[in-house]
Amino acid sequence: MHCPFCNAADSKVIDSRLAAEGCQIRRRRECISCGERFTTFESYEVVMPRVIKSNGKNEPFDEAKLRRSLMHALQKRPVTQEQIEAVLSDIQLKIRRLGERDVKSRMIGEIVMQALFALDHVAYVRFASVYQDFQDVEAFRRQIEQMQQREQECEKHDV
């Protein structure tokens, strides 16, 4: 690691600690040339798979796009920013756990729908209406009926 003070190439680590809830390593270093001390942080690189769109094109995974979709579906809903961040992280974790280099946008949509179903049913229907391209009120009605059936099945298994 180059020294930020004298740009010498050699430094020694004098202390290492976990930081950022175990996601980073904080290292205290000392320059061998000038003796100045400085801190560095080391973290892993998270590589998300590429997204294969329905038209066959592929593009890099875009966290900002996912966040906008969630925020739009959750607009004016009683959901905290912390809950949104947790859902966002959970969705990305599930996508990474697929273990694929390329993931179809349809699969990502299904993962998002599962997360929204668990978080807020209104947001789930909002997202589904865009994602599944509802054309009329009947499509909304069918989606809500499916959601209610799913809820009843979950309640039966919980008892």
UniProtKB/Swiss-Prot annotation:
GO terms for biological process: negative regulation of DNA-templated transcription. A zinc finger (unnamed) spans 3-34. Its cofactor is Zn(2+). GO terms for molecular function: ATP binding; DNA binding; zinc ion binding. Residues 49-139 form the ATP-cone domain. It comes from Acinetobacter baylyi (strain ATCC 33305 / BD413 / ADP1). InterPro entries: ATP-cone_dom (IPR005144), NrdR-like_N (IPR055173), RNR_NrdR-like (IPR003796). Keywords: ATP-binding, DNA-binding, Metal-binding, Nucleotide-binding, Repressor, Transcription, Transcription regulation, Zinc, Zinc-finger. Negatively regulates transcription of bacterial ribonucleotide reductase nrd genes and operons by binding to NrdR-boxes. Binds 1 zinc ion. The keyword RNA-binding does not apply. Belongs to the NrdR family. The gene is nrdR. Pfam families: ATP-cone, Zn_ribbon_NrdR. This is Transcriptional repressor NrdR. PROSITE patterns: ATP_CONE.
